[in-house]
C-alpha cells in the first residue's frame, strides 16, 4: 500500500457566488485552508514528496494567483466592473474562473494545478472556507 502525505496551504481572498440566494451573493472574504494529499512510494529521503516542494511549487502558484485577491465567476457583471477598477488602480489582478468560486470549484481548480506542478500522484484537494465548512475534489 502506498503512503499518503498531506500539506496545508493557507491564503486570504474575497469572492462572491452570484446565483446564491443568501449572503454569499454579497462580496466577502475568507481565510482559506487548502489540504493537498499526494500518494506514492517513499523516495530515498523517506518522503512521498517533500512538504517544502509542495509549498514551493503549489504555494507559489496560490500566492501569485489567489492570495489577497478576489476570485470571481467570469461574466459576473458586478465583479467584472470591480476587477476593471482594480486594474485601473494597478492593484493585484482579480482571478476569473469559469465556474462560481465556491469551495467545490476551488478544490477542482487547485487539484488541476497541483497535478501539473507536483511530482507525485495528487489524490485529493480539500478547501476549507471556514473552520467548519470544506469541500473536496478527488478523481
Predicted ranges, named:
Residues 1-139:
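Charge-rich, low-complexity N-terminal segments
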Amino acid at each position: 500500500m502506498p503512503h499518503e502525505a498531506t500539506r496545508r496551504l493557507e491564503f486570504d481572498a474575497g469572492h462572491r457566488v452570484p446565483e446564491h440566494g443568501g449572503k454569499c451573493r454579497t462580496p466577502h472574504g475568507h481565510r482559506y485552508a487548502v489540504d493537498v494529499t499526494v500518494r506514492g512510494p517513499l523516495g530515498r529521503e523517506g518522503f512521498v514528496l517533500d512538504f517544502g516542494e509542495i509549498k514551493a511549487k503549489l504555494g507559489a502558484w496560490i500566492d501569485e494567483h489567489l492570495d489577497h485577491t478576489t476570485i470571481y465567476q467570469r461574466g459576473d457583471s458586478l465583479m467584472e466592473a470591480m476587477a476593471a477598477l482594480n486594474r485601473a488602480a494597478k492593484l493585484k489582478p482579480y482571478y476569473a474562473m469559469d465556474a462560481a468560486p465556491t469551495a467545490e470549484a476551488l478544490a477542482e481548480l487547485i487539484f488541476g494545478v497541483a497535478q501539473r506542478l507536483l511530482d507525485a500522484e495528487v489524490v485529493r484537494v480539500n478547501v476549507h472556507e471556514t473552520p467548519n465548512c470544506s469541500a473536496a475534489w478527488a478523481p
